[in-house]
Design a protein with these regions (language model features):
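Active-site-adjacent loop/helix surface patches within enzyme catalytic domains
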Residues: 1-127
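Basic/polar, cationic surfaces and motifs that engage anionic cell-wall
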Residues: 99, 103-194
Length: 194
């Protein structure tokens, strides 16, 4: 019950006509911190205003920090395709890694198991499993150049080229190709670097 400034009491009558958000993307990050404990502490302090749905430790430990249907604060300013509010449409997964070290086998195995569950539960298309650097090129570099995207793509998570072309086909339009897969090409150099 709330009393409004004009003295009127609000009345609560619940409805069954609502739903929670449905995640359509998974954004993969690295923590840029030195331990899973440090990341968990950062994500539980109100003043940091940063969070993720899951954190995966170097040892493969998976910590869920937020219900999948709720909006975490992991993506910040970025876009993919026409979606400019990535936090509202995605699940954020942070990998405990400072960005300069290889990702452990245990960590990647846990990530693959979690992605299998999330992709099935929410019917997330494989091309919608992307990195933070994809949605915020030049601003973010995670999950780092050491992240095994090819391994994930071979398991059905994310995309990876079947072959590397030595030369682009005649009349190939880089900007159009990047836009088709979801990149924001307002800053073409940034989109290419992502």
């Amino acid at each position: 019950l709330t009393i409004l400034k004009n003295g009127v009491n609000t009345e609560w009558i619940s409805t069954v006509n609502f739903n929670l958000r449905k995640p359509n993307f998974i954004i993969i990050h690295h923590t840029a911190q030195d331990s899973i404990q440090q990341t968990i502490k950062t994500f539980t302090l109100a003043h940091t205003q940063v969070s993720a749905h899951y954190v995966i430790g170097d040892d493969g430990r998976v910590v869920q920090m937020l219900n999948d249907y709720l909006r975490a604060w992991h993506a910040g300013n970025g876009s993919w395709g026409k979606n400019t509010d990535i936090n509202s449409a995605s699940i954020g997964i942070e990998l405990d890694n400072n960005g300069s070290e290889p990702f452990s086998e245990a960590q990647i195995n846990s990530l693959l198991a979690l992605l299998t569950k999330l992709k099935k539960d929410y019917n997330i298309p494989e091309q919608n499993i992307i990195g933070h650097s994809d949605i915020a090129p030049r601003r973010k570099v995670d999950p780092s150049v050491l992240f095994p995207w090819q391994t994930l793509a071979e398991k059905g998570f994310g995309i990876w080229p079947d072959q590397v072309l030595e030369q682009a086909p005649t009349n190939f339009n880089v900007e159009q190709a990047l836009r088709i897969i979801g990149n924001n090409t307002k800053n073409l150099a940034a989109a290419i670097s992502a």
